[in-house]
Amino acid sequence: MKVLHVITGLEVGGAAQQLRLLLRRLPAHCEVVTLTTPGPLAEAIEADGTPVTHLEMTGNRDLSVLPRLSALIRDTAPDVIHTHLYRACVYGRVAARMAGVRAVVATEHSLGDAVIEGRRLTRGVRTLYRATERLGSATVAVSDTVAARLRRWGVPERRIHVVPNGIEAHRFAYDPAARATLRARLGLAPDTFVVGGAGRLVPGKRFDVLVRAVTQLPGVHLLLAGDGPELEPLRRMAGQFGSGDRIHLLGADGGEPGPVPGDGPGVPRMLSAIDVFVSPTPDQAFGLAALEALASGLHVLHGSCPAVDDLPADQAPGARRFGHGVHELTAALRELRRTEPGRLPVPPVVHRYDIDRSARELTAVYEQALAAARRNRPAPEPATLPAGPPGLPPGFSLPDPSPAPAPDGHSLSQR
C-alpha cells in the first residue's frame, strides 16, 4: 500500500511529532507533503527514510497550491491520501478529488469546542470544513471527545473513526539518577516540592495560570519546558510577582534538545525531576503532555485531557481535573504538597495509548477506505460551494480562522 500524507506544516508540535512516530511504524510505503514550514522535523522525517515535499504555500488563501498538489498526487499515484490539520484537510480533499483519488483519510488533531489549532472557530470555517469533508472517505478523531465534536458539526457517524494518539512510554519512565542530576544543576534540594509543565508557550495553553499559581506557594519551584511567543511575558510575570528565582523556563525540549526536536532527553529528565505535572489548557483534543507525565508515574492536574477524561477513573488514578482559575490550581497544588504523594505506578491508561497500537488501528482505517474505493462505491455527496476561479472548485476559498483570545479575554501582555 502506498500512502501520501499531506500536512499543513512540520513545525514542532503534537501533530507533526505524532506523524513522525506513525511513519516509523506504518506497514506502507509513505511519502509526506507539507504545505508550509518544513523545519527540522522535515529533515528528521527524511533522515528516517520518508521523502518530504514542500509546496511553499504562501498563506491560507493561496489557491495556486491546489493544481500543484493535484499534479503531485497524480505523479505519486498513492493508494490512500491521509491529511493532517485543518488547512491540509480542506485543500488535500479537494486536490485528491481533482486527481481522481477516492481513498482519502483525514485526522483531526486539534479540534476543540471553540478553537481549532489555537484559533477561534467561525461559521465560515465550520461550513467549509463540512463541505469538503464530504469529499473524503474517513475522518479520524484522536479521542472520543473529538468524535463527539465532529458529530455535532454534522459529520456522519459512518465516516468517523476514533484512533487515539500514542506515545513511546518507555522514553518517559521515571529515572532517579536523572532527577538528582537535574535538581543539582538547578540548585534544587532533594526535598524541594517541584511542579512541572510542558508545551508550546502560546496564550491558549494558559501557562500564565500555572505561573501565577506557583508564585502563590512559597518555596515551591516550577520547571516549564517549551518555547514560543509567551516565553518572555511569562518570565516578566514571574519577576513581577517576585518569584523569578523559582520559575525555571527551560526552553524547547526542556533545555536539552537532541539533534531533532522532540527527541532530546530534556522533557523525560524534567518529568523525573518534578513531583506533580500540570496541564492548564482548558480545551484540548487529546492531552499528550499529560499522558507522558502519567508514564513517568506523576500525579497530574489538568484543565482538559480527553485521553483521561474519556475513560473510567481507575484507568488514571493519579490524574485529576481542576477548575480553570488560579485559585483552584493553587489549592490543588497546596494539598498535594501537604500530602507528599510520591511516585505512582504507571497507570493502565498509558498502556492503552501505545503508538504501535495507534499504527495498527490506522492501518485498518486505510484498508477499509481503500477497499471501499476499489469496490467503486458511489462517490460521496458533492460539496456545494459558491462560484470561483476557472480550473478550481467553484468559489473555493479558505476562511482564515480568527486568533483566539485567552479565555478571560486578555492576553498575557495585558496582565
What are these regions (language model features)?
Residues 73, 252-253, 258-264, 269-274:
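Short alpha-helical donor nucleotide-sugar binding micro-motif in glycosyltransferases
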Residues 5-64, 149, 228-229:
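N-terminal strand-loop element at the rim of the active site
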Residues 13-21, 193, 197-216, 220, ...:
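A conserved mid-protein helix/loop that constitutes part of the nucleotide-sugar donor-binding site
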Residues 314-327, 335-340:
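Conserved acidic donor-binding segment of nucleotide-sugar-dependent glycosyltransferases
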Residues 145, 166:
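Carbohydrate-associated surface elements
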